[in-house]
Amino acid sequence: MSDPNANEAEKNIEIWKVKKLIKRLEAARGNGTSMISLIIPPKDQISRAAKMLAEEYGTASNIKSRVNRQSVLSAITSTQQRLKLYNKVPPNGLVVYCGEILTSEGKERKVNIDFEPFKPINTSLYLCDNKFHTEALAELLESDQKFGFIVMDGNGALFGTLSGNTRDIVHKFSVDLPKKHGRGGQSALRFARLREEKRHNYVRKVAELAVQNFITNDKVNVMGIVLAGSADFKNDLNASDMFDQRLATKVIKVVDVSYGGENGFNQAIELASETLGNVKFIQEKKLIGKYFEEISQDTGRICYGVEDTLKALELGAVETLIVFENLEVTRWVLKDSNGAEIIIHSTKQQDAANRDRFMDKETGQEMEVVSQESFLEWIAEHYKDFGTTLEFVSDRSTEGNQFVKGFGGIGGILRYKVNFEQLNEVDDDDEYYDD
């Protein structure tokens, strides 16, 4: 696929999958120390890892507790079998999790996971514990491009970061600077000198705090820095010898904003968006902004809600599918007394409030559950079947929040106008859809 946007969207889906996996693995707990976390970095050898596992097997054979010994040996064997699936370490490295976990009902369940991460994982790890270790995976997500922001005005300064679609305020402080003085004579010179001194101290304090916030272990911890503010403070800082040279070389944009503080930070993100280009926060705002634009222009080229969006997908009408990354909808596949499959999408609240949907209309009994899975996971696997692009969004931007609260966190930008009312009339029963 040569389309960079499509590649970016696919990468975002991979990132989303890893986020979900981390959540699941972090929650898992074992009985004893039989949960194996194995990470092999790129360019390492499968044979080295296999040799190490063989040695571990020998050591584990001496564990005194019979139950724990058997669990550990079983987990090592599962890990060895996973390794046999690979002739060599994939370009981005290899991550393997194997072991027995305790389910919420207290039963033991085997977990065997192996995958190549979406970007190189430069960590070598082997741990046998009562939990899975996901720290290296979490770092992989965090090491997305991060930008630093310094917003200065006459009332104070704010230090912030933007990474992916996560915006953080790292530090802020207020300042009380004397205003320009109107009196003449010697007092005017004295006030001007005092004022200049206070401004100088303010710029110096910002320069010092910039080092504290944006340099870790003598290395700049952001991809680039945006200086923002009203008046000349940002330019004074940029030109000042007090501003650490390592940071000065990272300044990618200087922008004028009308406010200080958090509002100024938001405005600076907007104004620097072109320079930041690929940061997901901006992409998210643009994408949902485009969705809202279709609504305000009344083009009819949008859909929202699970059911209408699925109908539009079935028609092949959805150009871009937009889904909230934490959408809590379950996809149920049920079977009625005639053997017909019925698919229902519902939230936990809907399940509790409306059990009628699960009842067979002819017999009045509950229908057989064929399968039950997260709608998000299902759509992440099947979106390509509908000829659409899938974009996950957060609720951290104003637009994202509005999309989740006002439109249920799922919708699409359509290739052409679809008359959903007409489609609903065609459906005999708009609660159930056959595949």
UniProtKB/Swiss-Prot annotation:
Compartments where located: Cytoplasm
Transmembrane spans: none
Cellular component GO terms, alphabetical: cytoplasm
Matches recorded under InterPro entries: eFR1_2_sf (IPR042226), eRF1_1_Pelota (IPR005140), eRF1_1_sf (IPR024049), eRF1_2 (IPR005141), eRF1_3 (IPR005142), Peptide_chain-rel_eRF1/aRF1 (IPR004403), Ribosomal_eL30-like_sf (IPR029064)
SUPFAM superfamilies per UniProt: L30e-like, N-terminal domain of eukaryotic peptide chain release factor subunit 1, ERF1, Translational machinery components
Subunit text: Heterodimer of two subunits, one of which binds GTP.
Assigned protein family: Belongs to the eukaryotic release factor 1 family.
PANTHER family for this protein: PEPTIDE CHAIN RELEASE FACTOR SUBUNIT 1
Name of the featured protein: Eukaryotic peptide chain release factor subunit 1
